[in-house]
Amino acid sequence: MSAIPMEDYESIEALENVNVVYGSPVTNQSVFIQTANVPDARVRQAMLYAINREQILNELLSGHGEVIDGFLSSASPFFDETITPVPYDPEKAKSLLEEAGWDGSQTLRFYVNSGDPTFVNAASIIAAQWAAVGIKAEIQTVDFATLMSISGSEDYDVLAVQYTYAPVD
């Protein structure tokens, strides 16, 4: 079984002999920041405030999904409903970067799985949103095996990973 590419959703939904049912999200797309390379917590916080996750959800996933903070989606019995997602706030991001003395000439290496076009597109949106607040990121698309190797080596600044877990009964 495989996921249906996002670009095919509308045409499949339009088929008369198909009843589309959306289940709870079981895939989490996460961005990891290597703290050794981005040591100031204010910069890491700014990176999160600078991302408009609702825009990504709506533009790339047609609103099918959820914005969460944390590793587990609401489909997990271990999901913590008390955690409120950090809001999109580019002005707060800029303020945190200024407070941290961020060097805007620095370019972060942002590794993404080349095998997932939706995730590559999301990384492009994220990089543009970071650029709007003064954070440069160069996207490096690599195959999944290389991405996992880089993750284990910790030789990255930013890494985007997708996790899917089996739905629970």
Question: Where are the predicted features?
Answer:
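Residue-level signal for pocket-adjacent positions within structured domains
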Residues: 15, 28, 66-67, 73-74, ...
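Structural transition elements
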Residues: 66-99, 117-121
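Ligand/substrate-recognition segments at binding pockets and active sites
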Residues: 4-5, 98-165
